[in-house]
Regions:
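C-terminal motif of bacterial Sec signal peptides marking the signal peptidase cleavage site
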Residues: 18-21
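Short linear sequence elements within intrinsically disordered, low-complexity coil regions
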Residues: 9, 43, 56-57, 239, ...
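A surface/extracellular/periplasmic glyco- and lipid-processing/surface-interacting theme
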Residues: 71-116, 121-378
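Bacterial N-terminal signal peptides that target proteins for export
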Residues: 2-10
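Ser/Thr-rich, Proline-interspersed low-complexity disordered segments
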Residues: 14, 24-80, 85
């Protein structure tokens, strides 16, 4: 390679300097090239992960709307009220009623929504009638009022009722006075006697009476009227069409002695049942009308004597379950009664396990020691 020495460049530089001085303008600085910029280092970028294809979303399953079955609150033929679940807004009232021969005829059971009939002792039965304030009509007289038994208290506990009675067996009184499941109203106690009256037309103890007004007053005094309980009451249906009805009746049943029967006969005019006592019409003392109900339930309940009881009292197993017969629409159906614990309400179930529905109107419940004591006729 050939090189140029500095002596040959000197004349050229001198000439350039003279030319700049003669121009009269400031010298423009020679632009200096910017230093080369290095390219940024490449940064490795992670490749995007392949996106997974979302699983297809299942179409929402339509939830069927449950069918609401109406629960009628009154008999369409007679207008008699029904103790229907969902309509109970006040505490029910239960009254123990005498069924000794000297107590005939009784008063006020024709106004009850539900009546229980069970053995007391020596073949004599006792009633427990349910009145529902705001549902059942007023009863100006109810009675004769008698004493309680343990199994009646167990039934009463399932209704959380104001429970009116006149004394009772030691076992029944002990539970009635100790449980918080009922409001106890004993006519033989000082705090209860003001709501009852003795009639001069009969001899004691078959002459003690009360009324729905007096019992409501007792409930008010105890601040025990409101009781909105969705579990109270029974399920009802409309009457079967006339073409589907029959005339089958629980014509006769007895508790101990066959010669002392009670029973019912089917009434096609009301699609209900008329009560018989020893084969003749059983009537209300005040109205003179034959006792009537829309539904009859006959349940089998095991019983046994209470050891050492000098009054011949018995115990009945009303906690648990057992067979029963239901009569309505002139037909007979096999059902099962269930009351799993003392505080639980008494319920009845069909063979398919569904809770039984009754015809709207009164219900009469009979507790027999054996269904063999029941005679059914058409």
């Amino acid at each position: 390679m050939r090189t140029f020495g500095l002596p040959r460049l000197a004349p050229l530089l001198t000439a350039l300097a003279l030319l700049g001085a003669c121009s009269g303008q400031a010298a423009v600085p020679t632009p200096v090239a910017a230093p080369p910029t290095s390219a940024p280092a490449a940064v490795a970028t992670a490749a995007p992960a392949p996106s997974s294809t979302p699983a297809p979303t299942a179409a929402p399953t339509a939830v069927p709307t449950p069918t609401v079955v109406p629960n009628p609150t009154a008999d369409p033929i007679t207008g008699a009220p029904a103790f229907a679940r969902g309509s109970v807004k006040n505490r029910p009232i239960l009254v123990m009623i005498d069924n000794h021969p000297q107590a005939y005829p009784q008063t006020g059971m024709d106004k009850a929504a539900v009546v229980f009939e069970a053995l007391a002792e020596f073949g004599v039965t006792r009633f427990m009638a349910l009145y529902a304030p705001g549902i059942t009509p007023e009863a100006d007289q109810i009675g004769p009022v008698r004493s309680t038994r343990l199994y009646f208290v167990h039934w009463a506990m399932g209704f959380h009722a104001l429970y009116a009675h006149a004394g009772g067996s030691p076992q029944g009184l002990a539970l009635a006075e100790s449980t918080d499941e009922i409001v106890n109203l004993d006519a033989l106690h000082a705090d209860g006697e003001d709501y009852f009256v003795r009639s001069r037309s009969r001899a004691a103890p078959h002459n003690l009476y009360t009324s729905t007004d007096e019992l409501l007053r007792a409930a008010e005094d105890r601040k025990a009227i409101p009781l909105e309980d969705e579990q109270q009451g029974f399920l009802f249906k409309t009457d079967a069409p006339a073409a589907e009805r029959s005339t089958i009746s629980p014509r006769s049943y007895f508790f101990i002695y066959p010669q002392d029967p009670a029973g019912w006969v089917y009434d096609p005019d009301t699609n209900g049942y008329l009560r018989l006592r020893r084969g003749v019409a059983a009537r209300d003392a005040a109205s003179g009308e034959q006792l009537w109900t829309k539904n009859v339930l006959v349940m089998e309940v095991a019983e046994r004597p209470i050891p050492g009881d000098d009054k011949g009292r018995i115990e009945q197993d009303v906690i648990g379950e057992g067979p029963a017969k239901l009569f309505l629409d002139g037909v007979e159906r096999d059902v099962t009664w269930r009351k799993p614990e003392p505080t639980a309400p008494l319920r009845f179930y069909d063979a398919d396990g569904e809770e039984a529905r009754f015809n709207a109107g009164p219900i009469w419940v009979v507790a027999l020691p054996s269904l063999e004591n029941l005679t059914v006729k058409q």
